[in-house]
Regions:
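Conserved N-terminal substructure of TIR/SEFIR domains
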Residues: 1-90
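Cross-kingdom TIR/SEFIR domain
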Residues: 2-14, 56, 76-145
Length: 145
């Protein structure tokens, strides 16, 4: 299912209702709270915040790289090393798959690394979001998620 930006706004508003309906299912069968590495395009903050809100209402613990104080101020090799550590640390990997994120080299790099770490465990997913014209690029390989 591909979401439009308008539909994402509607879902954000409905997250409170979803939260109440799913309070009893906030933990996985292991009894641990879900933790999610959230990959996203940095200039698409609005979409990221809405997706993060929905996941937090479902009681997931979220990692967003630009909120991490240990990140270097300028993108570098150490940036990639920290991202790799965080992808390994968090239980699940979700790409906020906007058209911009699909075009982003960093998002694709993160998706590739996340795939290597999480795919066999079934703990990787896309959160596809189309612009309101319902045009979502996607890539053929993204169909496996």
């Amino acid at each position: 299912m591909i979401l439009t930006e308008n539909k994402l706004k509607e879902l954000t508003l409905a997250a409170d209702v979803l939260s109440e309906a799913h309070r009893q299912t906030r933990f996985f069968s292991t009894g641990q709270q879900a933790s999610v590495f959230l990959s996203h395009k940095h200039d698409e903050i609005s979409q990221l915040k809405r997706v993060a809100y929905i996941l937090e209402e479902l009681h997931a613990s979220i990692y967003v790289d630009w909120l991490d104080n240990s990140m270097p101020p300028k993108t570098s090799g150490p940036t990639a090393a920290i991202i790799k550590q965080q992808i390994q640390k968090y239980d699940k990997f979700i790409l906020v798959a906007t058209n911009g994120a699909i075009d982003s080299k960093w998002c694709n790099w993160e998706l590739g690394y996340g795939d290597a770490q999480k795919f066999d465990l079934g703990k990787i997913a896309l959160f596809p979001i189309a612009q309101n014209d319902n045009n979502w690029k996607g890539s053929e390989y993204m169909q496996i998620y």
